[in-house]
Amino acid sequence: VDRYGSLLLNHKTYIDAGHDEYWSGQQRTNVEAARDAGVNLMFWSGNEVYWRTRWGNAYSADGTPYRTLISYKETWSPSASIDPSNEWTGTFRDPRLSPPAVGGGNPENSLTGQLFKVDDVGSNLQAITIPYDDANLRFWRNTSVANLQPGQTATLTKNYLGYEWDE
């Protein structure tokens, strides 16, 4: 999709089917262009389009292009860009060190419709409480949550959702 984005226009739908968090700036530009041209987009997992990356040549003697995925995760840098290139490789949403014109400040939900929320590896996630107001969502059909009454809540088991999810 990064190199041959125009091929997306040959299709009615683009399906992103799994934990696809590392995207190059050109990949995102191409998917946005396809969307703007009428291609339907489907994102079937969480934590997509999160880290902005770039492609580099292989480290082998032949230096084959597009063989090395580069991500300095500059969002984790406290105050300065650490990637030696001028291309931002932090999160798409981070505007601190990279304005939208060069790759930052453009959150993933502006493309996917959802925002990555939790990355809680190695800790004990707390139980999740579902209020009555959410009980009628389709997700809860045929579960005990769907039977909540006004003022009631349901509590999911600790660690139920895993350690990464979107909002």
What are these regions (language model features)?
Residues 1-57:
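Helical hinge/lid and interdomain linker segments adjacent to catalytic or ligand-binding clefts
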Residues 59-62:
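Short, hinge-like loop/turn segments at secondary-structure boundaries
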Residues 65-167:
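Glycine-rich, aromatic-lined ligand/substrate-binding cores of catalytic
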